[in-house]
Amino acid sequence: MVKEYKTITQIAGPLVFVEKTEPVGYKEIVTINLPDGTTRRGEVLDSSSDIVVIQIFEGTTGLDKECGVVFTGETLKLPASIDLLGRILSGSGEPLDGGPRIVPDQLLDINGAAMNPYARLPPKDFIQTGISTIDGTNTLVRGQKLPIFSASGLPHNEIALQIARQAAVPGSESAFAVVFAAMGITNEEAQYFMSDFEKTGALERAVVFLNLADDPAVERIVTPRMALTAAEYLAYEHGMHVLVILTDITNYAEALRQMGAARNEIPGRRGYPGYMYTDLATLYERAGIVKGAKGSVTQIPILSMPGDDITHPIPDLSGYITEGQIVVSRELHRKGIYPPINVLPSLSRLMNSGIGAGKTREDHKAVSDQMYAGYAEGRDLRGLVAIVGKEALSERDVKFLEFADLFEQQFVTQGRNENRTIADTLDIGWKILAHLPENQLGRIDNKYIQKYHPAHRKGQ
């Protein structure tokens, strides 16, 4: 027999406090019955004392102490089916595209669990995004978690959509899917995401979850877990390689802070909960490859750094959990460069596992290292030119200064719909490296220079 409690003691922000007489499970789903016959859903946040703390998904406006509370004994579940592909859903899994509700093959608990480290396989297969600054110098590897560090006003949404459209595991295109989850976005951004997915045809192999800024903060905490549960289902039940794009993790962390404040928790750094590191890890650590499974889950979380501060707790803690970072640069954006990705502070820690002969191309690492070194030197020389002028530079220094400009104009810059193969990316790299004297290409083996350098290829 289902019991209805009418023992609400307090309503504060998105939280309802209920006196209980029987044990209640953590994260148990609750139904709130209003006097007008409508219902709302909530989730148990704390059941350690006689007072249960419940967060309400639809907000607490209109609730009072006369409302009935029913504990369902179930956790929040995703209706999982292969029919998820091609659908646009709300942050809590409700259809936004006018289609029917998903008829589930399984109902999966969205809280999931981090992978057993013993069951993990090391990531080693290249994922092609079609963006040279990622594929060429900060390669994404299947099973990796590689965040994009951006900032307010920078085109991280455009970059996210371009990756969603273009990403593929070469040779496994038929088994590749994208799960895209946006948190705390405006209605305008939601329309932009929906129309882009529909116009470009990317929706056919994607599942999209959209949580709007005016949706309850509680739903923002649920959204990435819905997305990751969908990804795990497609990966481990249907053998697909799934790329999960989560944007914007900063909005997720703000929702955590808001919920912590509503519960009168003692805040940590800059007002964020002390458990934020652990909470972020429960999201990021759901990426990977499991022994015996055909599919995999790869993550690209996108976060906007408040005040462009890379030491802010959100990027700082994310950096400890993830395997590198792609940094979007305001300086390059001001120059009109798209995508404005700065390769110097960017890093993919698993890059060397996913490149080379049989994966990308034998010269990949050498070309990447040489371009990185040349661009770093050219950037340093720009600072020197600002002090002493270009006339004071040697002929060699001028070549590196010009190389930095070519790198930004030809390698970094590409169209929003330009999908470069890894061969295209490396060939562009060789084209701009040809601007440097051969005796300055010290990071590239001579056999690769003889095989791929434009000056030698012409004679072949």
From Swiss-Prot:
It is found in: Cell membrane. Component of the A-type ATP synthase that produces ATP from ADP in the presence of a proton gradient across the membrane. The B chain is a regulatory subunit. It is a peripheral membrane protein. One of its GO terms (molecular function) is ATP binding. Its main location: membrane. Belongs to the ATPase alpha/beta chains family. GO terms for biological process: proton motive force-driven plasma membrane ATP synthesis. Keywords: ATP synthesis, Cell membrane, Hydrogen ion transport, Ion transport, Membrane, Transport. One of its GO terms (cellular component) is plasma membrane. Has multiple subunits with at least A(3), B(3), C, D, E, F, H, I and proteolipid K(x). InterPro entries: ATP-synt_VA_C (IPR055190), ATPase_a/bsu_AS (IPR020003), ATPase_A1-cplx_bsu (IPR005724), ATPase_F1/V1/A1_a/bsu_N (IPR004100), ATPase_F1/V1/A1_a/bsu_nucl-bd (IPR000194), P-loop_NTPase (IPR027417), V-ATPase_su_B/beta (IPR022879). It comes from the Archaea. This is A-type ATP synthase subunit B. It comes from Methanosarcina barkeri. PROSITE patterns: ATPASE_ALPHA_BETA.
